Regions:
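Thiol-/selenol-based redox modules, centered on thioredoxin-like
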Residues: 41-101
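Structural micro-motif
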Residues: 12-16, 31-51
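Structural microenvironment flanking redox-active thiols in thiol-disulfide oxidoreductases
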Residues: 1-25
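Short, charged, surface-exposed secondary-structure boundary motifs
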Residues: 26-30
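Glycine-rich, histidine-containing beta strand-loop boundary motifs that form or position
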Residues: 19, 63-65, 130
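Extracellular/lumen-exposed scaffold segments
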Residues: 78-243
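A generic "binding-loop/recognition-motif" signal
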Residues: 1, 21-22, 56, 122, ...
Length: 243
C-alpha cells in the first residue's frame, strides 16, 4: 500500500488505486500477462489495458495490448468512443470537399498507441468513391513508412449505395461527412527507445487520394499530401518511492 501511495502522490493521482497482492484478481479475470517469464522481475503484471465503464459500472469498451510497454492513449480512446477532442487541427478546402486533420495526441512516447484522424466533408451534391470500388479511384490513405512506427490498416466507415441512373450503375460512395482513422504505435523495443531518445519530435507523412463526382461531372482523381508532427517525451522510469 505504501508503494501505491507514493506512486499516486508523485503522479498526482486522486482516484482510488487497488492493490492486487499475488496477482490474484488479474488471474481470476484472465488478465495476467502470459508473455512475461516467471523469472522476469515484472512477472505477475497484467496485459496493459483500459476498461471504459458507464455510470452504472458496466463495461462499455475494452482496449488491451499484448506487449506490456504498449498503451492506448486516453485521447485516442476518447475519440474512438465518439467524445469531442480539443486537439489542434489543420483544415484544407477544395471545390469538392473540406478536409480536417489532427492527431489525437500532441506528445507521445515509446509504446504510445494513438490515432491520426482525417474528417472529410463532401460538398453539396458531391460524393467520394469508397474503398473497393472499381472503375473509379476509391478514397485511400498511404502512410510513408519509417523506422520504429507500426501502422494498422486505415479504418473507413460504412459507405452508402449511389445509383447513377444515366449509366445504370450502383456504386459505394460517401456523400455525407465521414472519418478516416489511422492507428499508430510507437515501438518500445530497445533499439527503438535508443533511437527515439535523441529525437524531440516525430513527423508522419501520408498521401490522401480520392475521386469526387457530382450528379453531372466526374472530377479527376485528387492527391493531397498530409502530415502530422507530434512531440516525443521521455518515458517515466522512476519507480514508486523514488527507488
Amino acid at each position: 500500500m505504501a508503494t501505491l501511495a507514493a506512486f499516486a502522490q508523485r503522479r498526482a493521482i486522486t482516484f482510488p488505486l487497488l492493490s492486487d497482492a499475488g496477482s490474484e484478481v488479474i488471474r481470476r479475470y484472465g488478465l495476467i500477462n502470459t508473455t512475461v517469464p516467471a523469472a522476469n522481475p515484472t512477472f505477475g503484471i497484467p496485459f496493459p489495458g483500459t476498461l471504459v465503464v458507464d455510470r452504472e459500472g458496466r463495461v462499455t469498451a475494452r482496449y488491451f495490448e499484448t506487449p506490456y510497454q504498449t498503451r492506448h492513449t486516453v485521447s485516442s480512446i476518447l475519440v474512438d468512443i465518439g467524445r469531442p477532442t480539443r486537439a489542434p487541427a489543420t483544415r484544407v478546402s477544395s471545390p469538392q470537399l473540406d478536409l480536417t486533420t489532427y492527431s489525437t495526441d500532441a506528445a507521445v512516447s515509446a509504446g504510445s498507441a494513438f490515432s491520426l484522424v482525417l474528417d472529410l466533408e463532401p460538398g453539396p451534391l458531391m460524393h467520394v468513391y469508397a474503398p473497393g470500388v472499381s472503375g473509379y479511384r476509391p478514397v485511400s490513405l498511404t502512410i510513408d513508412p519509417q523506422l520504429f512506427i507500426q501502422l494498422d490498416p486505415p479504418r473507413f466507415p460504412p459507405s452508402e449505395t449511389y445509383e447513377f441512373k444515366p449509366l445504370k450503375e450502383r456504386v459505394q460512395v460517401y456523400s455525407k461527412p465521414f472519418r478516416i482513422r489511422q492507428d499508430v504505435r510507437v515501438e518500445a523495443s530497445g533499439p527503438a527507445q535508443a533511437a527515439l531518445k535523441s529525437m524531440d519530435h516525430l513527423t508522419i507523412t501520408d498521401t490522401l487520394t480520392y475521386q469526387a463526382c457530382d450528379d453531372k461531372v466526374y472530377f479527376n482523381p485528387t492527391t493531397v499530401p498530409v502530415s502530422w508532427t507530434v512531440q516525443l517525451k521521455a518515458l517515466d522510469r522512476e519507480r514508486a518511492g523514488g527507488r
